[in-house]
């Protein structure tokens, strides 16, 4: 087994050297640091397997609890064992609440420390293996789908990931803007560094100011909690719904973007390296025109503009998305894995989905919960099992509209009404894709073009697969 790197952080040199010697005898590779600055530098250069951390760190810029907070934010799985010569029960409890693996008082028994350290490393190893196993089953940063719109979108994400420019993600509510940001980070050179999400929605101006810049009227002088910008250093900062940031903070953010420099409580200026991704469901240009967003800030953040397609634009992906959500819910929520019938999928594809991907996932979950697998109920999900509001607002594929009485019509007229409704629903289902619609309904594309013209069903020019064929069919 390869040696595990363990960082020892203590302001007393004799303690550092003693622990380091004992760890070396036990097959560990010890690293030492006398203060918070040295400790965080060592970890940022190469994450260690575990940390043994003194809680006080006299003369250090940040005390042990502050270092613990930073480590758990950046490396949630990294085990930290807290040591202290004059701690209290309250201090120990606080350390454990903040994520410390355990707490041990000085003077400590060397064998006890070694046993504790080995146990912490083993537990962390099992956690990592469990996470790796789950990620192989379902990748939470996977963009599901293979329709042309999605493939183009995936290519745009790859370009955004390879770029060092700032990125603004535009998309409707529930379309997957955070997923896009995660994918960009995952495919970038910063993948092994922090990915920090900051959502200013529902925050006060003072709270946003404190989180980003560490400035607050209520902040005590000895409160040196790192800011969001410090946490994101060398990584990616994703600011969700950037339009919710008030003008005073926009001014400060604009100033920061000019040189990416932050000022610490001591007055020292520090340069940080952050890839900034923002997102919005609003039209920021309209916000600029209405005086709600700084024009200069908009231009600085919107260097690379990425539009997230709505679910309506990628209805062909719905079968794959449904399978993905069913598998995900089965693995992590305990719901039985089910199969949606072709008719149920068709009904889902005919819906407009104003809530986009998020709404589809909720509908799949609701359907599985409300239709449990029983002895009298097979595994197939039928259309009637889907929420009634979805069916009511879908293009109906199973019956004629109520606005006419089929029995009162001649055969030719009734057939024409049925064909219009049927083809309209199928075209909507396949997002006006002539090729896929014709393949499903069993018609040649040219014949389908003629039939649509005869029924006065028009196709948007952007969805005509072959303009030359279209013109020939409509000549």
Swiss-Prot record:
Gene3D superfamilies, from UniProt? 1.10.8.60, 3.40.50.2300, Homeodomain-like, P-loop containing nucleotide triphosphate hydrolases
- Keyword tRNA-binding carried by entry: no
Provide the GO MF annotations for this entry: ATP binding; ATP hydrolysis activity; sequence-specific DNA binding
Q: Which domain of life does this protein belong to?
A: Bacteria
The UniProt record gives the binding positions of ATP as 171-178, 232-241
Tell me, what does this protein do in biology?
Member of the two-component regulatory system RP562/RP614.
The species this protein belongs to is Rickettsia prowazekii (strain Madrid E)
Describe the location of the Response regulatory domain by residue ranges. 5-121
A Gene Ontology BP annotation from the UniProt entry:
phosphorelay signal transduction system
Specify the protein name. Putative response regulator NtrX-like
């Amino acid at each position: 087994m390869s040696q595990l790197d363990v960082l020892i952080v203590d302001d007393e040199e004799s303690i550092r050297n003693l622990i380091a010697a004992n760890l070396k005898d036990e097959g560990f590779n010890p690293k030492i640091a006398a203060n918070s600055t040295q400790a965080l530098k060592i970890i940022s250069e190469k994450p260690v397997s575990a940390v043994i951390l003194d809680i006080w760190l006299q003369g250090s810029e940040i005390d042990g609890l502050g270092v613990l907070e930073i480590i758990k934010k950046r490396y949630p799985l990294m085990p930290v064992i807290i040591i202290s010569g004059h701690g209290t029960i309250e201090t120990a409890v606080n350390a454990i609440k903040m994520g410390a693996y355990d707490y041990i008082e000085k003077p400590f028994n060397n064998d006890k420390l070694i046993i504790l350290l080995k146990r912490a490393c083993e537990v962390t190893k099992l956690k990592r293996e469990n996470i790796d196993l789950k990620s192989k089953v379902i990748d939470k940063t996977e963009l599901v789908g293979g329709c042309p719109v999605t493939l183009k979108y995936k290519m745009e994400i790859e370009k955004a990931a390879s770029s060092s420019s700032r990125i603004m993600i535009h998309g409707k509510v529930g379309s997957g803007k955070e997923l896009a940001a995660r994918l960009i980070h995952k495919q970038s050179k910063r993948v092994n560094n922090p990915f920090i999400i900051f959502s200013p929605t529902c925050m006060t101006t003072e709270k946003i100011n404190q989180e980003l810049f560490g400035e607050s009227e209520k902040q005590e002088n000895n409160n040196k909690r790192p800011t969001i910008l410090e946490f994101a250093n060398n990584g990616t900062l994703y600011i969700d719904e950037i339009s919710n940031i008030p003008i005073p903070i926009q001014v400060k953010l604009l100033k920061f973007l000019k040189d990416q420099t932050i000022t610490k409580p001591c007055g020292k200026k520090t340069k940080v390296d952050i890839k900034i991704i923002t997102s919005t469901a609003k039209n920021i240009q309209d916000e600029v025109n209405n005086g709600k967003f700084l024009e200069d800030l908009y231009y600085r953040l919107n260097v690379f503009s990425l539009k997230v397609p709505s679910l309506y634009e990628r209805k062909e992906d719905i079968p794959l998305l449904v399978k993905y959500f069913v598998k995900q819910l089965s693995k992590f929520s305990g719901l039985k894995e089910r199969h949606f019938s072709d008719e149920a999928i068709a009904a889902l594809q005919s819906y407009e989905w104003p809530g986009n991907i998020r709404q589809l996932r909720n509908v799949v979950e609701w359907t599985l919960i409300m239709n449990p697998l029983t002895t009298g109920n097979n595994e197939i999900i039928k259309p009637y099992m889907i929420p009634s509001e979805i069916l009511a607002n879908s293009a109906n594929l199973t019956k004629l509209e109520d606005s006419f009485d089929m029995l009162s019509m001649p055969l030719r007229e009734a057939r024409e009404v049925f064909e219009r409704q049927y083809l309209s629903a199928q075209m909507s289902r396949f997002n006006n894709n002539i090729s896929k619609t014709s393949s499903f309904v069993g018609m040649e594309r040219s014949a389908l073009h003629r039939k649509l013209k005869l029924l006065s069903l028009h196709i948007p020019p952007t969805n005509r697969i072959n303009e030359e064929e279209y013109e020939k069919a409509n000549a």
